[in-house]
């Protein structure tokens, strides 16, 4: 028996060393492609001029920290979720609340708007993702029409509808992501590969195929093929948890925001990190990132209550936005690119333009 154990250990050790040497070879191959820096390529590009953005609307109504928000495709409505267990649908033009749902649990960490605008999904410490249809009949009880779609073995950290209302993608503290059928609640595909909690995910723009990117507490950002369930690319250059990932509008790159106080840009075709957005004066983690519609600007919300705006090509900061009175937890650019909304632990959401 003891010899069996020894053999197993030896095999394990040899497999580990083989894996390490393969990793080394991969890094060498990656390094061969590393012939020029992004800011060098962008040297001839004109610098951005004066950049002014202000808070145009403040949405008040949550009784605790705002944890997540998403825009409706109609460019007007917003769904937000909070630590108080409430999920609210807002009209961002008038600041009116159109719907409110009280979840059975607090810490609703994830919420998403369906592409049709006719439903919302949310979840958190209840380990599941619930879908609520939205109707404008004031007497209708939304909670009665709730569908429980996804079941994880730990908290739900993020959710997103695919390009239809019929499928939903979830990320969880159990270290997995999963694709579910909304109607039947059936698991269609699961994605295993993260070594710790998955904190965020983002779907590739629809033209670029069936992939999504996820980030988590293992400091890894992973790109997945939704059809096969396989990880097709992985990037491990952050020094702490990855809180947010967002695809570049063309789908050829993605940005990440991390507790290591940096945001980074990864080029999928070059298969490597191409830019780091950081300053010595920024010492707090980045909680949320999103691109402008053109992809030239990167908006990043931080735990020091600020929002930094970065020039993606030149790597420089073009603006810093003040207004929130606690950490910025979530941030999304509107579908038409005219504004963005940020949510904060100060219980409010702000629409900037």
UniProtKB/Swiss-Prot annotation:
Chief place of localization: membrane
Swiss-Prot/TrEMBL GO biological process terms: G protein-coupled dopamine receptor signaling pathway; negative regulation of voltage-gated calcium channel activity
Localisation: Membrane
Domain of life: Eukaryota
A GO term from the CC aspect: membrane
Keyword check for Glycoprotein: no
InterPro entries: G-protein_beta_WD-40_rep, Gprotein_B, Guanine_nucleotide-bd_bsu, WD40/YVTN_repeat-like_dom_sf, WD40_repeat_CS, WD40_repeat_dom_sf, WD40_rpt
UniProt WD repeat ranges: 61-100, 103-142, 151-192, 194-236, 237-276, 278-320, 323-352
Gene Ontology molecular function terms on file: G-protein gamma-subunit binding; protein-folding chaperone binding
Keywords of the record: Membrane, Repeat, Transducer, WD repeat
Assembly with partners or alone: Component of a complex composed of RGS9 (isoform RGS9-1), GNB5 and RGS9BP; within this complex, the presence of GNB5 stabilizes both itself and RGS9 and increases RGS9 GTPase-activating protein (GAP) activity. Interacts with RGS7, forming the RGS7-GNB5 complex; within this complex, the presence of GNB5 increases RGS7 GTPase-activating protein (GAP) activity. Interacts with GPR158; promotes the GTPase activator activity of the RGS7-GNB5 complex in absence of glycine, in contrast GTPase activator activity of the RGS7-GNB5 complex is inhibited in presence of glycine. Interacts with RGS6.
Job of this protein: Enhances GTPase-activating protein (GAP) activity of regulator of G protein signaling (RGS) proteins, such as RGS7 and RGS9, hence involved in the termination of the signaling initiated by the G protein coupled receptors (GPCRs) by accelerating the GTP hydrolysis on the G-alpha subunits, thereby promoting their inactivation. Increases RGS7 GTPase-activating protein (GAP) activity, thereby regulating mood and cognition. Increases RGS9 GTPase-activating protein (GAP) activity, hence contributes to the deactivation of G protein signaling initiated by D(2) dopamine receptors.
Family designation: Belongs to the WD repeat G protein beta family.
The protein's name: Guanine nucleotide-binding protein subunit beta-5
């Amino acid at each position: 028996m003891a010899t069996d154990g020894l053999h197993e250990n030896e095999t394990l050790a040899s497999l580990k060393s083989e894996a390490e040497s393969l990793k080394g070879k991969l890094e060498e191959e990656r390094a061969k492609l590393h012939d020029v820096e992004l800011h060098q390529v962008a040297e001839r590009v004109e610098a951005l001029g004066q950049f002014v953005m202000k808070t145009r609307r403040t949405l008040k109504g949550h009784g605790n920290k705002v944890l997540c928000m998403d825009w409706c495709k109609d460019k007007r409505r917003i769904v937000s979720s909070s630590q108080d267990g409430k999920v609210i649908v807002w009209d961002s033009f008038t600041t009116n609340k159109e719907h409110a749902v009280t979840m059975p649990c607090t810490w609703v960490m994830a919420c998403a708007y369906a592409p049709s605008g006719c439903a919302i999904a949310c979840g958190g410490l209840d380990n599941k993702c619930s879908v609520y249809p939205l109707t404008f009949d004031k007497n209708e009880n939304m909670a009665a029409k709730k569908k429980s779609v996804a079941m994880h073995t730990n908290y739900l950290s993020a959710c997103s509808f695919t390009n239809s209302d019929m499928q939903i993608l979830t990320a969880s503290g159990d270290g997995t992501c999963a694709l579910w059928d909304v109607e039947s609640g059936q698991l269609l595909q699961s994605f295993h590969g993260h070594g710790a909690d998955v904190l965020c995910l983002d779907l590739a723009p629809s033209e670029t195929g069936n992939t999504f990117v996820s980030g988590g507490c293992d400091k890894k950002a992973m790109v997945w093929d939704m059809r096969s369930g396989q990880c097709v690319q992985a990037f491990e250059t952050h020094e702490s948890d990855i809180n947010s990932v967002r695809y570049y509008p063309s789908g050829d790159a993605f940005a990440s925001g991390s507790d290591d106080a940096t945001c980074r840009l990864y080029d999928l075709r070059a298969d490597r990190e191409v830019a780091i957005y950081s300053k010595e004066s920024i010492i707090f983690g980045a909680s949320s990132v999103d691109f402008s519609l053109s992809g030239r600007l990167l908006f990043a919300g931080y735990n020091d209550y600020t929002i930094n705006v970065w020039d993606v090509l030149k790597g420089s900061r073009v603006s810093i936005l003040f207004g929130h009175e606690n950490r910025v937890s979530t941030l999304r650019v509107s579908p038409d690119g005219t504004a963005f909304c940020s949510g904060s632990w100060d219980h409010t959401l702000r629409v900037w333009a």
